[in-house]
């Protein structure tokens, strides 16, 4: 009985740590509640967040700058990892977008643009062993 309880608590801890590392917020606003973000994730981003999905065979590095000039804490998205969500809710309201930069692990720029909230940025395989970016707005 104790073994089942320990195994269950380990699974819950692992699941919560995966959830926490896939949600990125403004460095000045560490609130856990983001208005506009769905309670249960569907297959698209909420209106106040940007979703980044890596479906390529390459690891990518994501960085950016929020509207107020504060940099996003850079993070890596590994090949076929679960989606990452960048919250645009800070200073008490939802911001329109941010400058987003996505580079390959070797430093080659894949995407550099101002990205609006509610956008899904999908990194997909391209040609032999490269990657390209596809955008969808919901």
Predicted regions and their residues:
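Intrinsically disordered, low-complexity segments enriched in small/polar residues
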Residues: 19-138
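Sec-dependent N-terminal signal peptides
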Residues: 5-14
């Amino acid at each position: 009985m104790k073994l089942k309880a320990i195994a269950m608590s380990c699974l819950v801890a692992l699941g919560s740590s995966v959830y926490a590392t896939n949600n990125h917020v403004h460095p000045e606003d560490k609130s856990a509640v983001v208005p506009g973000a769905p309670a249960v994730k569907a297959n698209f981003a909420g209106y106040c967040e940007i979703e980044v999905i890596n479906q390529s065979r390459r690891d990518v590095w994501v960085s950016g700058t929020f509207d107020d000039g504060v940099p996003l804490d850079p993070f890596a998205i590994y090949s076929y990892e679960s989606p990452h969500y960048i919250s645009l809710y800070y200073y008490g309201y939802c911001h329109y977008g941010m400058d987003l930069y996505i580079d390959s692990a070797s430093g080659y720029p894949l995407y550099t643009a101002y990205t609006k909230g509610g956008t899904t940025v999908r990194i997909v395989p391209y040609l032999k062993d490269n990657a390209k970016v596809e955008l969808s707005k919901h």
